[in-house]
């Protein structure tokens, strides 16, 4: 697969800059520790029980993180699309085995960031540290709390509409069974919600 590395590197840079100002010198240091990675649909990025070494920026494609219980039942933990980072944060931070698997739902172009080297850069560069703090606050605190509250306070239709507002084309790209699992409902429930919305539109 041929692709424009400069474009996707710039997409990653813009992602960083959306959280905090970063100098060109610091960005060059980041560029030195990234690698492009191609993943085919159905391939595994991170397996349950594997220790994560990298965090991945999604340039193109979609992935899901899923948990398998003792009975073999699978539950989607998250769905990741373009412009998002995918990885096991707990595994990266604690260097412990991941509790979930990350699988490609589409052919993907990813940028892999070596987390150990990335942490070294954070410790040496205040602008990268400011970005890291801002990213953690938004994604690991604010959005996590908002999603937990939504699971309790919002009904399934509201959660589905929120998902469509963030990702309008998701229902055309991701199998509905994965979307349903992500929302904490059954595929049958999601089908009813979609039919009801179609009738009212």
Label for each model-derived stretch:
Residues 190, 194-197:
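DNA major-groove recognition helix of helix-turn-helix
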Residues 44-104:
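Cyclic nucleotide-binding regulatory domains
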Residues 160, 200-201:
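Short, Lys/Arg-enriched C-terminal cap helix and immediately downstream tail that follows
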Residues 1-35:
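Cyclic nucleotide-binding regulatory module and flanking cytosolic helices
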Residues 1-8, 43-55, 109, 178-186:
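Short N-terminal helix-initiation segments at or just after the protein's N-terminus
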Residues 37-39, 80:
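Hydrophobic residues at beta-strand termini and immediately following loops
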Residues 103-187:
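Polybasic "coupling" helices that flank or enter modular domains
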């Amino acid at each position: 697969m041929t692709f424009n590395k400069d474009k996707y590197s710039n997409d990653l840079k813009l992602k960083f800059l959306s959280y905090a100002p970063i100098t060109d010198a610091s960005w060059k240091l980041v560029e030195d520790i990234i690698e492009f990675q191609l993943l085919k649909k159905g391939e595994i990025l991170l397996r349950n029980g594997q220790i994560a070494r990298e965090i991945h920026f999604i340039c193109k494609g979609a992935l899901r993180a899923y948990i398998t219980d003792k009975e073999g039942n699978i539950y989607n933990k998250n769905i990741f699309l373009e412009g998002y980072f995918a990885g096991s944060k707990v595994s990266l931070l604690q260097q412990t085995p991941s509790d979930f698997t990350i699988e490609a739902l589409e052919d993907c172009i990813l940028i892999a960031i070596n987390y150990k080297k990335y942490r070294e850069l954070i410790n040496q560069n205040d602008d990268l540290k400011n970005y890291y703090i801002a990213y953690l606050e938004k994604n690991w605190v604010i959005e996590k709390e908002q999603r937990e509250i939504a699971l309790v306070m919002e009904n399934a239709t509201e959660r589905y509409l929120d998902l469509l507002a963030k990702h309008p084309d998701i229902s055309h790209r991701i199998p509905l069974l994965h979307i349903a699992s992500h929302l904490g409902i059954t595929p049958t429930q999601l089908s009813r919600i979609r039919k009801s919305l179609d009738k009212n539109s």
